[in-house]
Structure formats: structure tokens, C-alpha cells
From Swiss-Prot:
Biological process, per Gene Ontology: cell division; regulation of sporulation
Protein purpose: Involved in cell division and chromosome segregation.
Taxonomic source organism: Thermotoga maritima (strain ATCC 43589 / DSM 3109 / JCM 10099 / NBRC 100826 / MSB8)
Designated name of the protein: Probable cell division protein WhiA
Pfam families, per database record: HTH_WhiA (PF02650), LAGLIDADG_WhiA (PF14527), WhiA_N (PF10298)
Keyword Mitochondrion: no
Gene coding for it: whiA
Length: 295
């Protein structure tokens, strides 16, 4: 059965959540309520709920919840599609009004269980190697708003909301908030992996920024040196270096002979500071601009 669905980063998280120990009966019902709000379809006449799940891990957890609550499951179907991503598991179970009596938004233990059910049934997380994004699909606007508020109140997690044509999504972009969310719903092993990935990305990002800075600085230096050489050549061709003031002539000659040296290194040769060399080269460029474009 597992081979029918692609194993994603989200599925690996959900596989870990399958084994989170059950708490009180109220917490179990709260988790089941999360499944109902995200992927449940109530048939009032037959008093059954039909769950349509895209995760086999979530399906196993749901079956365990129903077993704990002694609610029989009447049907389990794996729906097939031409698109492998659209395959899902359909589970029909007996409905009880007690499922809807629980209020999970005012007690942190109940809310955590509710969140676990939401994420297992309607949530996903992208692989943090690429970018940071966790989202949960929800249809009810009121449930979405209450979930967002409780995330802020209980865990100081900032969640956003986006409305699409057929559904609404609650999403979290901050990796810090994502880690708090996952830890709250019971993820442990995957948290360590995510921490390592985040650290690696930070190191790589720091290295890339340093390399980019060095490259940009090298390009600026090369362009500046080329401009200085061009200016000196223009003066040499049009008025002769010998007609420059002595201090400028000395700088021009040393620059021509040492095109690879930095301003600081040129200054050492002439017993001048870097700023003095820079100032004299600017004067040379200004003189050269009389004879042509110095770029």
C-alpha cells in the first residue's frame, strides 16, 4: 500500500506522529476533531463521517484514534487516479455528536492534539533544504481564524492565511515558528534533522555572502585600476607625464609599472598612505578627462 504514494518530507514527519502516545480521552477527541475539520465530510442521514486522506501515516493514526474511541470503521478504500499525487485513502467511520462538543481553542493540551490532527490530515511541510514553509488546508473560515489566534496566544506563532478558490490555507514561514509548531505536536526525531539542515543553510549562506563580497570587491578594484591606467595613458599620449607635477608624476609612473598592486601597496612603495595615493590618482584622472573619456 505504501508504494502507491510518494514518500515526502511531510510524510516522514507524519510517520513519526503516528506513534505519539495518546493522552486523555478529551485529547484524543480533539485530535480526531482536527481530522474532521481538515478532511472530514459528515453524512447526517447515515450518521457516518467520510475522511479523504492523502497520507497513509495519517490513515493509520486515524484508525488508531477510532479504535481507542471504540468507533467502528465501516469502509477503507484506496482511490486510484492517473495522477499519482491525487491518490488518496477514503475511510468511512461511525459519527458521534461527542466529536463536535470539544472546544480545543481554550486549553493548550486540547489545542496541541487538535493541531496534530489538522497537520496529519490536511498539513504539509516543504523540505527545509529548499525553503521554509508549513501549511494546513482548512475549509471553515471560523476554524481557521480560531486556530491562527490560538497559535499566537499559546505559542507566539505568527501564521498567515491565504484564500484560494476551493479552500483556505493557514501557513507559517518562519523556521523558528515552524520548529515550535512541530515540537508542540510531538515531533522529536525530525526536529534534529531540521536543526542540522537550518545550520547547514546558514553556514552556506554566510560563505556565499562572503564570496560574493570578495568577488564584487575584486571587480570594483579591477575596474578602478583600469580607469587609472587609462587616465595615465591619455596624459602620456597628449601632454607627456613629464609635464605633471612631480608628486603626480611619481604616482603615475609607479602605477604603470605595478598594475596589479592595491592602493595600500602602492603607498608603501612611495611612503604614502592609501588615502594620499587615492587622492593623487583622482587628480590624475581629472587631468586626463580633458583629453578623452576615462572609463
Amino acid at each position: 500500500m505504501v508504494s502507491l504514494l510518494r514518500r515526502t518530507f511531510s510524510e516522514e514527519i507524519k510517520e513519526e506522529l503516528v506513534n505519539v502516545p495518546f493522552g486523555s480521552r478529551e485529547e484524543v477527541i480533539s485530535e480526531l476533531l482536527g481530522f474532521i475539520k481538515a478532511r472530514g465530510d459528515l453524512d447526517v442521514k447515515s450518521r457516518h463521517i467520510v475522511f479523504s486522506l492523502h497520507s497513509f501515516a495519517a490513515s493509520r493514526r486515524l484508525l488508531n484514534l477510532m479504535k481507542y474511541l471504540s468507533k467502528p470503521v465501516s469502509e477503507i478504500i484506496v482511490e486510484k487516479s492517473h495522477n499519482i499525487k491525487k491518490r488518496y485513502i477514503k475511510i468511512t467511520a461511525e459519527y458521534s455528536e461527542s466529536f463536535m462538543v470539544i472546544e480545543p481553542f481554550f486549553d493548550v493540551a486540547l489545542f496541541v492534539s487538535f493541531l496534530r490532527g489538522l497537520f496529519l490530515s490536511g498539513g504539509s511541510m516543504t523540505n527545509p533544504r529548499y525553503h521554509y514553509h508549513l501549511e494546513i488546508n482548512l475549509f471553515e473560515e471560523e476554524t481557521l481564524a480560531l486556530t491562527r489566534k490560538s497559535l499566537k496566544d499559546f505559542f507566539n506563532i505568527n501564521a498567515g492565511i491565504i484564500e484560494l478558490r476551493n479552500t483556505r490555507k493557514l501557513y507559517i514561514k518562519s523556521i523558528k515558528d515552524i520548529l515550535v509548531f512541530l515540537e508542540a505536536i510531538g515531533v522529536q526525531r525530525k526536529l534534529e534533522e531540521i536543526d542540522r539542515i537550518v545550520t547547514e543553510r546558514k553556514v552556506i549562506g554566510d560563505v556565499n555572502r562572503t564570496v560574493n563580497f570578495i568577488e564584487a570587491n575584486a571587480i570594483r578594484t579591477a575596474n578602478s585600476t583600469a580607469r587609472q591606467i587609462r587616465a595615465i595613458e591619455l596624459i602620456k599620449e597628449n601632454m607627456g607625464l613629464e609635464n605633471l607635477p612631480e608628486d603626480l608624476r611619481r604616482v603615475a609612473l609607479v602605477r604603470l609599472r605595478n598594475k596589479e598592486l592595491s592602493l595600500r601597496e602602492l603607498g608603501k612603495k612611495l611612503n604614502l598612505t592609501k588615502s594620499q595615493i587615492y587622492s593623487k590618482l583622482k587628480r590624475i584622472i581629472k587631468i586626463a578627462e580633458r583629453f578623452g573619456d576615462v572609463k
